[in-house]
């Protein structure tokens, strides 16, 4: 189990910018694939608490993550888990790790109220950049593909300055995007 304070900056980019950043910072790297299975209630109680719950499948491992707001960034509760998710599956609250159960109870989420509502597949590249983690994602959900640059940092102010300088190299102006789970559910609602 791990709990961490996630501070990251994100920027949606187009296909050409994705390729330019890939050529500049990720030349020799091979992407890995991960699938996020998004879990919610029918009435979107997690969203209403500005939180998200997912099971991530990566290299035949399964990890459940609950993200909740913090003063700066998000608090992530991460646990390895044995649940092999599929769309439509009910996730029984009492089978989840205790710290996640506790927060879900605080959100007034019932025992059988959670289910897997969809999946998003990401091809991810990661590299250390100025003592931080630079991430380049190509994500696919339904018939949509989007490209995103992420920069995970330890200090908000210093990290933001580094991110701004990185964006300037590609003539980008920082426009904080909605996160993947928000984009996923908003796009799903349009279908």
Regions found by a protein language model. Name each.
Residues 1-191:
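Phosphate-end processing signature that detects enzymes handling 5′-triphosphorylated RNA
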């Amino acid at each position: 189990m791990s709990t961490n304070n996630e501070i990251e900056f994100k920027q949606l980019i187009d296909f050409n910018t994705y390729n330019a950043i890939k050529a500049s910072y990720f030349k020799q790297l091979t992407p890995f694939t991960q699938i996020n299975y998004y879990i919610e209630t029918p009435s979107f109680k997690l969203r209403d608490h500005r939180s998200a719950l997912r099971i991530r499948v990566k290299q035949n491992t399964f990890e459940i993550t609950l993200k909740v707001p913090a003063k700066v960034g998000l608090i992530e509760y991460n646990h390895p888990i044995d649940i092999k998710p599929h769309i439509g599956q009910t996730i029984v609250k009492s089978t989840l790790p205790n710290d996640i159960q506790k927060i879900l109870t605080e959100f007034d989420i019932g025992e059988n109220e959670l289910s897997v509502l969809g999946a998003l597949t990401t091809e991810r590249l990661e590299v250390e950049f100025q003592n931080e983690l630079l991430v380049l994602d190509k994500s696919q959900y339904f018939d949509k593909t989007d490209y995103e640059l992420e920069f995970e940092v330890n200090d908000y102010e210093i990290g933001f300055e580094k991110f701004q300088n990185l964006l300037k190299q590609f003539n980008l102006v920082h426009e904080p995007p909605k996160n993947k789970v928000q984009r996923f559910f908003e796009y799903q609602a349009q279908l």
